[in-house]
């Protein structure tokens, strides 16, 4: 009897999670009924999100019907929770409920949302439906619908959708064009290589960047000469071009136009010349670290905290929270700064960088703690007058919430609102999140590089959980294409900043403790 009891206990504790978490049809319907009964009564975001996430196990068509209403909720976090749950559903009947009405659906916002969540969930059945949606509704599709179709084909594979993707690369909305280029590159649709090459002349730099990346993935030999010529243009795209050229040729001359031009002109004329195979490229990539000193040589670069950039449109985001008033511990690293206070060290680095800027580099500065303060409303050129103004602003910066002057530690002004600072950098309202406009003239879209410096974890704001912040930044940067370099100073575990940099094409640097 005791042995039988032990066996039962072991089964309860160690049974597969899928068995334990499975719900019967009756349980699923009951969970949905209780959700619908109480959801409107809850006023707090946290309660609503928790209730939505509880429907993960209720993988049934009725749960889809209940969550459809939530997808229109005014709260961004609530809507995101509903998308997350829907993307996780796998039961055939549940998936069919989401797919069933897509072709004839009149609500463009709802259709685009279902396309998003189904593709996030890896539902290959969506591809057949997308063809029907396109054939029947092509002329009436909204910007958001076309954007989500392109993103879905990037996730699920664009093979067989060349005609649709080609049409999307010609859309008037730049977000749609770059999403289509991403899908072409990810799916390596070599039939469209010539069309992608033509996109190097797109008027929006983000679309040019997507075309450059796609050409690198397609390994289109005819793109080499035009890419080399584009190295003569100033700005951050030089780095993207150098990477694409490496992926096509397996050569590594960085942004050095003269070396690329000389080598390509000589070798491409040889009889029997060909670009390396994928296997040869993979081998070259493994050996690349040995030649990092050569990568990026040629051309003047600006540098902040040891991170170089060819960008001519830069934003510096600096933490001035209370903890920036602390002294560094490892003082041997900071002997040349005249002060061991963290903010003084950062101010010295930033001042040095600003002094080095030329009139062709446009820049701005944001200081943040609990709230965000911009030096200017827009990017300005590195002229003598603007640099003098910037240096004066830098000199005036002091940690907030330290008890000095009108600030006190108790007023909450010295906390770290990382999310608000990043949204200010993107020129977005934290409460609204990502909004597709199709407008490429917005001033924020001119920015292409951010240097983000902080000494602590997020402690206040709409989002403080690092996963939430990373998710929101990723959604925004799918169309912005801004490189985010991250710098930490002080006794701060930097895994968040490392990921923020890595996921956004940047470099992470730890200045020291």
Regions found by a protein language model. Give the residues of each.
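Structural signature of alpha-helical solenoid repeat scaffolds
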Residues: 53-56, 87, 119, 154, ...
């Amino acid at each position: 009897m005791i042995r039988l009891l032990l066996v039962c206990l072991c089964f309860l504790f160690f049974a597969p999670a899928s068995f334990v978490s499975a719900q019967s049809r009756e349980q699923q319907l009951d969970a949905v009924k209780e959700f619908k009964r109480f959801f409107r009564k809850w006023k707090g975001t946290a309660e609503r999100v928790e209730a939505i996430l509880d429907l993960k196990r209720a993988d049934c068509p009725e749960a889809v019907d209940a969550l459809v209403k939530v997808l229109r909720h005014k709260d961004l976090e609530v809507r995101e929770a509903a998308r997350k749950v829907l993307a996780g559903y796998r039961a055939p009947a549940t998936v069919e409920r989401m797919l069933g009405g897509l072709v004839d659906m009149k609500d463009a916002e709802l259709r685009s949302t279902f396309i998003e969540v189904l593709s996030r969930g890896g539902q290959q059945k969506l591809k057949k439906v997308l063809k029907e949606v396109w054939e029947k509704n092509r002329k009436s599709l909204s910007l958001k619908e076309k954007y989500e179709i392109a993103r879905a084909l990037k996730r699920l594979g664009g093979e067989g959708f060349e005609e649709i993707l080609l049409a999307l690369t010609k859309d008037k909305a730049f977000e749609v064009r770059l999403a289509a280029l991403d899908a072409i590159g990810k799916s390596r649709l070599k039939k469209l290589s010539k069309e992608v090459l033509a996109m190097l002349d797109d008027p929006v730099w983000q679309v040019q960047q997507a075309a450059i990346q796609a050409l690198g993935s397609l390994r289109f030999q005819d793109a080499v000469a035009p890419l080399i010529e584009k190295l003569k243009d100033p700005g951050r795209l030089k780095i993207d071009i150098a990477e694409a050229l490496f992926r096509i040729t397996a050569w590594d001359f960085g942004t050095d136009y003269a070396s690329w031009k000389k080598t390509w002109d000589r070798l491409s004329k040889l009889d029997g010349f060909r670009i390396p195979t994928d296997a040869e490229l993979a081998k070259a990539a493994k050996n690349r670290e040995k030649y990092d000193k050569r990568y990026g040589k040629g051309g003047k670069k600006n540098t902040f905290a040891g991170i170089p950039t060819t960008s001519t449109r830069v934003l510096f985001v600096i933490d001035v929270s209370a903890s920036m008033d602390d002294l560094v511990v490892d003082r041997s690293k900071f002997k040349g700064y005249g002060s061991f206070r963290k903010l003084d060290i950062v101010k010295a680095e930033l001042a040095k960088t600003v002094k080095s800027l030329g009139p062709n580099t446009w820049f701005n500065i944001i200081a943040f703690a609990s709230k965000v303060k911009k030096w200017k409303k827009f990017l300005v050129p590195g002229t003598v007058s603007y640099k003098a103004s910037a240096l004066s602003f830098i000199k005036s910066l002091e940690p907030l919430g330290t008890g000095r002057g009108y600030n006190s530690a108790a007023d909450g002004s010295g906390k770290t609102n990382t999310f608000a600072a990043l949204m200010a950098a993107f020129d977005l309202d934290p409460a609204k999140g990502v909004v597709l406009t199709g407008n490429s003239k917005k001033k924020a879209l001119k920015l292409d590089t951010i240097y983000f410096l902080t000494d602590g974890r997020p402690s206040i704001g709409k989002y403080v959980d690092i996963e939430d912040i990373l998710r929101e930044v990723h959604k925004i940067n799918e169309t912005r294409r801004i490189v985010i370099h991250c710098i930490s100073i002080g006794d701060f575990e930097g895994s968040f900043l490392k990921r923020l940099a890595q996921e956004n094409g940047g470099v992470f640097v730890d200045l020291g403790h």
